[in-house]
Design a protein with these regions (language model features):
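Sec-dependent N-terminal signal peptides of Gram-positive bacterial secreted proteins and lipoproteins
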Residues: 2-20
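Primarily recognizes the serine-hydrolase "nucleophile elbow" in alpha/beta-hydrolase
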Residues: 164-165, 171-215
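Gly/Ser-rich "nucleophile elbow"/oxyanion-hole loop immediately N-terminal to the catalytic nucleophile
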Residues: 93-98, 147-179
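A domain-start/cap signature at the N-terminus of enzymes
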Residues: 17-100, 183, 251, 255-258, ...
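Short, proline-enriched alpha-helix->beta-strand connector loops that line the catalytic pocket
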Residues: 135, 214-220
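Short alpha-helix in the alpha/beta-hydrolase fold that links the catalytic acid
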Residues: 118, 231-249
Length: 307
């Protein structure tokens, strides 16, 4: 019995969350998802059969269901990393003749694969709100197992797979991570920052180093509640300062630094005005923040751009 108890404590430590926090955060994130979702109806279509596609860089089994135009639970089978589960939306207009943008969104705890296939896009709105900023864009929503090194490697492998097998504009490859997904994102940017054009870190902390991302000069936007219940805002402040100081030491101008790293601390009123009591769970609201999402995609919000 003691051995089992110790194992449970160990597993919780790996996730970085206490049982009480996990329960509370999941509840709050569900509330936020309901608050920001403009489409509460579940669209579920079962195709007649699934099929496998052999592509360069891995074997893909395409998902057999859809949710709000996303194919749910496709799998990239990697010999080195194992199965990489993801949901994907490829616009009907894509025929390979024109380069498209690529957007990857990494979920929080509630969106990990063990929670259920497709739960990431059912509980977060980033993948759907992004469509209002870029019309010709492939959107990939990985379902990872945690927010450690293996998940970072899987994210990189999935990114490289789409870059190899689809006609992607290499100047328009965007990525965001919310909560635990932000921790994964920081490790991704520590390993292969040059794959991405811009990165958005939401309600999280930076687990990676800073050398690679500053050498590659990949713009990063940090956004979090001032009193985030899980992380607090200090880790983002520290990460921002570390990146800022590196650029300053290189002699980069203040104007240019402001384009490369942004710190956006939201006050309590930001969440209260939107009917959300939890600042951490309320991080889901950032998906509908036109300043935040507009920065990521370098464009203005447009209702007409939504597919």
């Amino acid at each position: 019995m003691l051995e089992k108890a110790m194992m449970l404590i160990f597993m919780l430590a790996l996730t970085g969350c206490s049982p009480e926090y996990i329960s509370e955060a999941a509840a709050n994130e569900t509330v936020v998802s309901e608050a920001v979702s403009s489409n509460t109806d579940t669209q579920k279509i079962v195709f007649e059969s699934s099929y496998d596609v052999q592509e360069t860089g891995g074997f893909v089994t395409e998902g057999t269901e859809t949710y709000r135009d996303f194919i749910v639970d496709s799998v990239l089978h990697s010999e080195e990393l194992g199965d990489i589960h993801y949901c994907v939306k490829i616009p009907d207009s894509y025929d390979g003749s024109t380069p498209y943008s690529l957007y990857i969104t990494l979920p929080g705890y509630e969106g990990l694969y063990f929670q259920g296939a497709g739960i990431n896009i059912r509980s977060e709105e980033f993948a759907f709100e992004a469509q209002k900023y870029k019309e010709n864009m492939i959107i990939v929503a990985p379902q990872l197992d945690d927010w450690g090194e293996l998940s970072a490697d899987k994210t990189i492998a999935l990114t490289e797979f789409f870059l190899r097998n689809y006609n992607i504009d290499r100047e328009q490859v965007y990525i965001n991570g919310y909560s635990g997904g932000g921790e994964t994102l920081s490790l991704v940017l520590d390993k292969r920052p040059e794959l991405y054009t811009r990165a958005l870190m939401c309600s999280s902390q930076w687990d990676g180093d800073y050398e690679a991302v500053t050498e590659a000069k990949i713009p990063v936007y940090f956004v979090i509640g001032e009193s985030d219940e899980y992380y607090g805002s200090e880790p983002f402040k520290e990460a921002y300062e570390a990146i800022y100081n590196r650029y300053k030491a290189e002699g980069i101008s203040e104007e240019e630094i402001q384009k490369l790293v942004v710190l956006d601390i939201k006050p309590a009123s930001y969440f209260e005005d939107r009917g959300v009591t939890s600042q951490h769970g309320g991080g889901g609201l950032f998906s509908r923040d036109e300043t935040v999402m507009g920065w990521l995609f370098g464009t203005e919000y447009s209702e007409q751009a939504e597919n």
